[in-house]
Amino acid sequence: MKGILVNYEFCTGCHSCEVACKKHLGLPEGEFGIKVSEIGPYEYEEQPRGSEKWEWTWVPALTKACTLCEDRTEKGKMPMCVQHCQAWCMAYGEIEDLIRHVDEKSRYMILTNRKR
């Protein structure tokens, strides 16, 4: 099974993935294949594990419109969101291979979608 690995610690919230996906799928206003949500900013009274005092994160999520760009990936290309990520914090591949890139130094998530 294939998916997208996101190191969301480095996502800048630029929305390039949203724009590229939306254009590729030809989605109307208000619909998305991938949607970046903002979490924060909020302040910790105590910094967990020596982290920053403030939390301000952007987290991408796939919607039901996402096809993982099957038309592109079948030709060996990357999904549009991965190709256009300005922070280079997204990777596409087999989930088993993506998991090997996960370490304890950063914050990751793996995004998948169901077959239609």
Positions of predicted regions on the chain:
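Non-ligating segments of multi-cofactor redox enzymes
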Residues: 1-116
